[in-house]
Amino acid sequence: SFLRAFVDYWFDLANEKADWNGKCVLVQPIAPGLAKMINEQEGLYTLYLRGSENGQKVDDKRVISSVSRCLNPYEKADYEKMMDVAASDDLEIIVSNTTEAGIVYDPACQQNDCPPSSFPAKLTQVLYHRYKAGKKGIIMLACELIDNNGKELLKCVNQYIDQWGLEDGFKKYVNEDCTFCGSLVDRIVPGRIRDPKEVAELEEKHGYADPLLDVGEVFGVWVIEGDTKLNDILPFRKAGLEDHVFVTPDMSPYKKRKVRILNGAHTGFVLGAYLAGFDIVRDCMHDETILGYMNKMLLQEVVPILPLDQDDCKKFAAAVEDRFNNPFVNHELMSISLNSTSKWRARNMPSFLEYIEKNGKLPTCLTMSFAAYIAFYSNNIQELNDKGLVCKRAKGNEYTISDDRYVLEFYNAHKDDDIPTLVHAVMTNEQMWGQDLTKVAGFEEATVKNLTLIREQGAMAAYKSCL
């Protein structure tokens, strides 16, 4: 949903406004996907951008025509077609958005896998095929929400080049002829409209049904880090989109502000809010306790430790409430919960640790957010199946957690632990956090206390205790 509501949208505008005449070929990162449906519609789909812009309500509908087709590389014929695209003279740009867990080096991936499981391994295969075909280098735009996403992706590709024993000429091609750019994406994309009544009303209004209908907020910014000469290659400045899509030599100020404030707010409150019975982000903004908890976390624990202009950060934080309160978008908390382990590590843990370094004490709300994360992943576990870890919340319904398999297996294995044992096991799992979090003074004791409060009195009482 995100790539279609963001990347393909900007290229669609470039086609219209700059006569770019480009097409996007989508490639599924995993076997289940929308390839068949997208191809049945010849790449066409309806996008609604909804929200507020300059104080005015916006509800724009656009049929996106920048997608030519979608390939599922887990099917042999499509894998071969992917390699045909790799060797095409027309290929100029590759864009990735495989979540925080996507840019990883997995040594189990082999050169002859069709396809390998990790995205960097797939990309290495694609670039090697292109190199052997004698084609020019490409521009790689990584959109994953990790620090130095472009550099980290290039690092993974180089690891596969070494592991697979590929020639030095190819390594030079990747590192010199190809351009790996980091980028920052900022648009909330809930995906499809889930209210059957609203879907029926739109179908009646526009005269057609679109099972690929996508929804995003009207706000959108894409910051690409690289040589500003890329502005002459990419179509966006020519299309007059430079306020929304632009190249800068250093995107770190934009990145840190967005990930720590906007994304950090999401991961910081949604897991506890879901356990408290909420399902939609907007509804959380109408609850004084959750809103107060989020604003305290942002304004007292996150913004003050950012080495950026404080007024700009406060304005950005203030806009978060408006964006989350979008009347058009039913952004489900469960959709945000995807890969929350790596999300908390990337979005919240840096603010948490830097706050402690600056203030010499634990940040109240960020500390609570970690306990809420553990509570969400361990709440009345029912089973572990192929779809994920099935838990049950107090409201009565089951929910399925999607995360790396090792994370789900970990929580399933510890489902009968008492609270202190579980907290200690989670905090000492360095595969999850990159360090032993029990070494943070007072953090383990505080998390045991907070998780106990959530389990005994509920997440809402826990959030209220932070205010």
Task: Show the residue positions of the predicted features.
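Substrate/ligand-engaging "lid" and interaction regions
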Residues: 1-467
